[in-house]
């Protein structure tokens, strides 16, 4: 009996654990502190800094089953998902890694043992082929002489991409940095399937499938292209779980493995589909995996960056559900079956099931409102199409008006053998972005990552000033030996009391000084293992090796500590008041305010906000001790410590406890006791995305300042109303009631004036071929009264065509009314469009009533004068 996907995942991890590898949990799909990546898309992403020498772990061998998403940017599989056997938006990458430990020999032997041993995967050896880089004789000989693979099944692959080292079998992290040859293992499904071995003209067939890629990082590529050997070569491997499951379960398509069969059946059940071979079932089964895990990792549907990619995937799934005949929201119902089929790998998702389901349901409901209208418009455009390409402007209009991502439009078009002008779409998108940038006043801001080889020791938990030594200086991202007065720079010290921005807490400010210099620190950031002090040399000169006195701005740090500790109290209070589904989705802690984003599906009620505020202040009055302990990560989680969104933790972690009320993993700086916070006040609660709320709050002196400000405002209002704070509410209610009464009386007067004006106007109507035509510009009439006047005039005049206009604050308002018996010849929408075009505007409406606006008031008389001729031509 073949292994299940869950059993294959566990067997892989167990095998490498038996070979001395640390089993490391999958990292978040949102890469930590890596702006170069949209999503985690490979097992090595979480170890990137280790390979670059910027980070160290307490193990030199690791193994993972890493959740990955490829659905945006360079690595984008979205358009092929559902139409091929092996494309997915979400997949799991099994991997084993060596950080300067074993190299080619052991990496190859491990792979061969796992794949062929009867104890493990027991694949027939004669079905396995391998490729090596053309000049990698060492790997070739290991495969041939030690493993025993015949030469005819070992294929050398050269530089097949048009440049030196540009090869399927040479891996590079970037233009510079670690790189090296790789060896790939292929499985031969047999001659009943079309395709040829790798490197042959038929290599794109499905007979020979790559199942494992083993990368040997042995060189450091320099800027001039030269390759220098690394002092400690490393290994990075990747094997797609779904691919190896297909091989071990004797199927040719990933969608036929047990995991997908179960999900496809669940999709069929919730959509009512009966044909299990329908490609839409495969699309939805794939998409629920990426969408659910992305939301669980903190991504929310939006119109930008990661959130937009998520929205695209959700909407593509919803559209395929629509094709299957789904009559109601269905997508969120697949989260439960997904959790069941993922087994132990779905535990994180299970904890957030309710939140994930709610976000998916809300997004589907929102899109459902525009889906049918958008599809109808697309059908109309395709019906009019004379060629085989839909223009980019139409694709953009579908996106801008109906929320259709361009790949969804492309999906519909592909089903009809029509292409989409994606270049035209991108041009329209870029024009919209340009307008948005100009409107916002913001341009691009790029901050290149500084490469620092040295490390800094942080001593800021216990010290706010200490002596250190300059180990590196950077100006404009480049290392320098010295800086002079007036220069902006980054200063790295061997030890520092300055806290570098992390975990939502901003970096410290302060001063680095000596007898002959002063460096003003405006920010502090991490650069790998180093801490960079960012600022300007105010006086003197500074060079590498100089001794400095590092002084943190103590008052600012104190305010930050209070806000950070209050954030922990508020997090715990939110979970008590709203429920345990609340989890942190982001935070900002500075010296003025704390901002906290958290998962919750609706706006907080006033009484809930008050309850959270009261609960936090109760803990402040308890004056609980705030204690820290260093322990193993797993032990901390077992103790109930909450790990925060987006953070990357070492195996040894800092656990922060506030009595029995709050326990979290945190590396930030905090008060000594909760009583130090003094007072906590929530100043705003709002939504930032579907399923995400944001609270802003203040503490200590900042909270007291808001109390004083509120009191001052109340006193001012009481003075204006000639009352006091005791009867202020009654006074306000009285004023509001009087205001409502006056507004009602004013509206009645306006309606009476409009009725009188209508009566006066009716006598000015002229006869045009048996129809009364009335065209008039009115002064002193509110635009919203025009519609009432047109209705009155239509009742008075019978068969009639009316155009009224008014100008307010330089803007033209137009309305056209046509009696029902005339709409077969004159349509109000066409008439108003003709007039509006002449005054720099546009508009539309029903055949009997239409409205428009314009910006060119000077052109209004001529535009109104043109109505008679236009109407006469229509009535002939």
Swiss-Prot record:
Compartments it resides in: Cytoplasm
GO biological process, alphabetically ordered: alanyl-tRNA aminoacylation; negative regulation of DNA-templated transcription
Superkingdom of source: Bacteria
Keywords from the named record: Acetylation, Aminoacyl-tRNA synthetase, ATP-binding, Cytoplasm, Ligase, Metal-binding, Nucleotide-binding, Protein biosynthesis, RNA-binding, tRNA-binding, Zinc
InterPro entries, per the entry: aa-tRNA-synth_II/BPL/LPL, Ala-tRNA-lgiase_IIc, Ala-tRNA-ligase_IIc_anticod-bd, Ala-tRNA-synth_IIc_core, Ala-tRNA-synth_IIc_N, Ala-tRNA_ligase, Ala_tRNA_ligase_euk/bac, DHHA1_dom
Catalytic activity: tRNA(Ala) + L-alanine + ATP = L-alanyl-tRNA(Ala) + AMP + diphosphate
Residues holding Zn(2+): 564, 568, 666, 670
Known cofactor(s): Zn(2+)
Enzyme nomenclature, EC number: 6.1.1.7
UniProt name for this protein: Alanine--tRNA ligase
